[in-house]
Regions:
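N-terminal segments that cap or nucleate solenoid repeat domains
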Residues: 2-47, 51-56, 61
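Ankyrin-repeat boundary/"N-cap" motif
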Residues: 4-12, 34-46, 66-79, 100-108, ...
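Ankyrin-repeat intra-repeat helix-capping/turn positions
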Residues: 18, 48-51, 81-82, 116, ...
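Ankyrin repeat domain, specifically the short helix-to-loop turn at the C-terminus of the second helix
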Residues: 24-31, 54-63, 88-97, 122-130, ...
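Coil-to-helix interface segments in alpha-helical RNA-associated scaffolds
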Residues: 49, 82-85, 119, 152-158
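A mid-sequence interfacial segment
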Residues: 87-89, 94, 99-111
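Ankyrin repeat (ANK) tandem arrays and their immediately adjacent linkers/low-complexity segments
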Residues: 102-107, 133-351
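Internal alpha-helical scaffold/solenoid segments in large eukaryotic proteins
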Residues: 103-139
Length: 351
């Protein structure tokens, strides 16, 4: 009787409740590399015991079987904190520690560092993995991880970074730049974060500041919503950044018209220039129309600039970089003419 090429649909639930002997009986009815689950990986991609994995390897299972998304069992488990034991077992059992996945060809070490699997990282080093191996984009595991690190990622990254740097992995300018960017984002959004997690996050950040030689990002000065707006920068590009940090909240709408002018001009620029309008909808159009209404309030731009602004808003979806820069410049100029805060009324947009 031919053996089935797919694992039972309830195999994942089975391995969490059944004994190894019962699992062997089920697998005995399947091809040794029968696949299943969302990724269509073989049995080694499931949370089996080390003894069960060893038995499967003795039966001839492919320890480096590639699932439909390009993951080997080791790569799959390396990307999950809950699967650290399985990943370590696979390394000990001879899985390919140089396997790569994804368009950027991230190695097992890249995945383990990014996931914060410290014990797996140590195991990989002991097995001879290169801690400075580069992805297709030319980034080492630490560089790649800091590149994409945000908020709570720093908590799990701190001990991994300390270990790798302790064994000689260099701290590059890329790492310092990425850390600075992540820290700035945290400080910008600090007010909106859960206070329960902040002590642990702050400890991780202080550790990384010292470890990487990065100057601490100062706490954000919150605008009170009533005082006259003070601008220190001279060029409009710098002024926009200064006003963004002062007036725009970490999430949601600004509390002043001036803040909404800066926020909307920035969101429009990002959606058009960075996203290619892929998220464009009626709400973006409503925001653009609101932006024009706002700059007609208080002390307006001169007549020629207002007409120019109206033209930019009318053709906003097809705007190029020059158009967006001009829209942003005029938005900043309007704020400089209206330094006394105006409260935002009812909004007809949600973004």
């Amino acid at each position: 009787m031919a053996k089935r090429k797919t694992l039972p649909k309830d195999f994942e639930q089975l391995v969490q409740t059944a004994s190894d002997e019962d699992i062997k009986k089920v697998l005995g009815k399947c091809d040794i590399n029968a696949y299943g689950g969302y990724n269509k990986g073989n049995a080694l991609e499931f949370p089996l015991s080390e003894e069960m994995m060893r038995w499967l390897i003795e039966q001839g299972i492919d320890i480096n079987y590639v699932d439909q998304y390009g993951y080997t069992p080791l790569l799959y488990h390396a990307g999950r904190m809950s699967s650290e034991k399985q990943a370590i077992a696979l390394v000990k059992l001879g899985a390919d520690i140089t396997a790569t996945q994804g368009l950027d060809r991230e190695t097992v070490m890249h995945v383990a560092v990014k996931t914060g699997n410290l014990e797996l990282v140590k195991c990989l080093i002991q097995a001879g993995a290169d801690a400075e191996v580069t992805s297709r984009s030319g980034e080492t595991p630490l560089e790649r991880t800091f590149h994409w690190a945000r908020t709570f990622d720093l908590i799990k990254l701190a001990p991994v970074a300390e270990y790798l740097i302790g064994i000689g992995v260099p701290v590059t300018d890329k790492i310092r730049t990425y850390m600075r960017s992540a820290a700035e984002d945290i400080e910008f959004r600090r007010k909106d974060m859960s206070p329960d997690i902040m002590p642990e996050l702050d400890r991780a950040m202080e550790s990384l500041y010292g470890l990487l030689g990065v100057a601490s990002v100062p706490r954000r000065v919150e605008y009170d919503g009533t005082s006259p707006i003070v601008i220190h920068e001279k060029r409009w590009q710098k002024q926009h950044g200064e006003l963004w940090n002062l007036l725009v909240p970490g999430s949601g709408h600004a509390g002043t018209v001036q803040g909404e002018v800066i926020r909307i001009s920035g969101k429009l620029a990002y959606e058009i220039l960075d996203n290619g309008c892929c998220n464009w909808d009626s709400d973006f159009k409503s925001m653009a129309n609101a932006l024009y209404r706002y700059i007609c309030m208080g002390t307006p731009l001169d007549a020629d600039e207002q007409r120019e602004f109206a033209g930019l808003i009318n053709g906003i979806k097809n705007a190029d970089e020059t158009d967006i820069n001009r829209l942003t410049e005029l938005s900043v100029k309007w704020v400089t003419l209206n330094l006394n805060p105006m409260a935002v009324g009812e909004l007809d947009y949600k973004r």
